[in-house]
């Protein structure tokens, strides 16, 4: 079984229920592995939400490992950007090595070979490499391609953003950089499930819980889940199993007059089977309304829980008669400051001529003036 980005130990500043949600999803994934009698489990990074997890997170992981170990099911893990140890730190998962936990690829590509059902399986791993380590990543991919080519069943574990699965300028590598002589490339880091056959089958298993509102659309389309992967004689088949314990989430963006109605509409249209958890609502309101009023309104919903609402008080555009006003008057009325109005006019002039240096000089002058005006 391949799963990823469990982020156990994650804690919300406002909702105690959220920490338990991540444990629930993690344990459901482990139960799926047991129910399907898998030979081994791989986890592709961000097992914990931080590299120094709390006692409860470690205990929950230990309990899961004990269930796997009782069935002689090893688990192979790599580090993500959240749980990668800093400098000389020790990995939390590594303390359970005596119970079948194998940490791979801390600082470089590393692999292990195990025999399952009479077939050798090479399991290799490269933990997250970004920042100053990014330049080494492509070299490690190449090194993995040149090691022990005799094995037909080859799995690579990696925790990176790969172009074209993510925004190119935020990726550490491109698909062409990946080694092509693996049977299955198990990815972590991106929280939505994705798969593509590029020679080897490559798949992001996705996260097991919704950690960001950016994941809600993906969750509504395909849920959260784990990959049950059958690999034999170099051939790979993937079965996706959805998790049922994931707390449903919706996002409501509305104005001060309509947000209550829109919350009701979205909650009534939400259909999630086999899940008794109350949906989590992320709310953003545009307009002039007090937080106290909003909190009173949402407290009336006993069928949902809410993260802290966001109130965006949209700026009021000054009403100036166009026939008598020039552009500088607009800037002065809107910004409320003569110097800022002058700066806006100068920046606009530089922008028209694409004079970036001129823009920066104007800002530096203003910054210097503000420093002189500020008290020590």
Swiss-Prot record:
Description of how the protein assembles with itself and partners: Homodimer. Forms a heterotetramer composed of two Mre11 subunits and two Rad50 subunits.
Molecular function via GO: 3'-5' exonuclease activity; DNA end binding; endonuclease activity; manganese ion binding; Y-form DNA binding
EC number(s) from the headed UniProt entry: 3.1.-.-
Cofactor remark: Binds 2 manganese ions per subunit.
Family, per entry: Belongs to the MRE11/RAD32 family.
GO biological-process terms attached to the record: double-strand break repair
Cofactor(s) listed in the protein's UniProt record: Mn(2+)
CDD domains: MPP_Mre11_N
Domain of life: Archaea
Function statement: Part of the Rad50/Mre11 complex, which is involved in the early steps of DNA double-strand break (DSB) repair. The complex may facilitate opening of the processed DNA ends to aid in the recruitment of HerA and NurA. Mre11 binds to DSB ends and has both double-stranded 3'-5' exonuclease activity and single-stranded endonuclease activity.
Coiled coil regions, renumbered to chain: none
Protein name according to UniProt: DNA double-strand break repair protein Mre11
Active site as annotated: 82
Residues that bind Mn(2+) 1: 5, 7, 46, 191
Keywords assigned by UniProt, alphabetized: DNA damage, DNA repair, Endonuclease, Exonuclease, Hydrolase, Manganese, Metal-binding, Nuclease
Inhibition and activation profile: Nuclease activity is regulated by Rad50.
Chain positions recorded as Mn(2+) 2 binding sites: 46, 81, 159, 189
Annotated source species: Thermoplasma acidophilum (strain ATCC 25905 / DSM 1728 / JCM 9062 / NBRC 15155 / AMRC-C165)
Keyword flag Translocase: no
């Amino acid at each position: 079984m391949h799963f990823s980005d469990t982020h156990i130990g994650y804690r919300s500043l406002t909702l105690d229920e959220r920490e338990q949600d991540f444990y629930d999803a993690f344990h459901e994934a482990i139960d799926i592995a047991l129910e399907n009698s898998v030979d081994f489990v791989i986890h592709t990074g961000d097992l914990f939400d931080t590299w120094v997890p709390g006692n409860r997170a470690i205990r929950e992981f230990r309990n899961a490992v004990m269930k796997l170990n009782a069935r002689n099911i090893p688990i192979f893990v790599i580090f993500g950007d959240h749980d990668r140890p800093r400098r000389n730190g020790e990995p939390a998962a590594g303390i359970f090595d005596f119970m079948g936990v194998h940490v791979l690829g801390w600082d470089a590509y590393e692999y292990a070979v195990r025999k399952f059902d009479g077939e050798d399986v090479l399991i290799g791993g490269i933990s997250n490499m970004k920042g100053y380590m990014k330049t080494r990543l492509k070299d490690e991919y190449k090194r993995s391609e040149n090691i022990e080519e005799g094995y037909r069943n080859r799995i690579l574990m990696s925790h990176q953003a790969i172009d074209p699965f993510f925004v190119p300028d935020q990726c550490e590598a491109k698909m062409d950089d990946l080694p092509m002589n693996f049977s299955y490339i198990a990815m972590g880091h991106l929280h939505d499930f994705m798969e593509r056959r590029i020679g080897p089958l490559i798949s992001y298993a996705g996260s097991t819980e919704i950690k960001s509102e950016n994941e809600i659309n993906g969750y509504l389309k395909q849920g959260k889940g784990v990959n049950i992967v059958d690999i034999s004689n170099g051939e790979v088949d993937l079965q996706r199993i959805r998790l049922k314990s994931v707390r449903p989430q919706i996002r409501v963006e509305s104005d001060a007059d309509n947000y209550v109605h829109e919350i009701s509409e979205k909650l009534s249209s939400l259909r999630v089977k086999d899940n008794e958890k109350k949906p989590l609502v992320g709310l953003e309101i545009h307009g002039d309304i007090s937080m106290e009023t909003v909190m009173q309104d949402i407290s009336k919903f006993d069928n949902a829980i809410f993260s802290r609402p966001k109130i965006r008080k949209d700026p009021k555009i000054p009403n100036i008669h166009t026939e008598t006003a020039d552009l500088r008057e607009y800037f002065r009325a809107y910004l409320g400051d003569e110097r800022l109005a002058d700066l806006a006019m100068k920046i606009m002039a530089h922008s028209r001529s694409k004079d970036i240096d001129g823009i920066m000089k104007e800002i530096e002058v203003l910054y210097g003036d503000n420093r002189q005006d500020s008290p020590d």
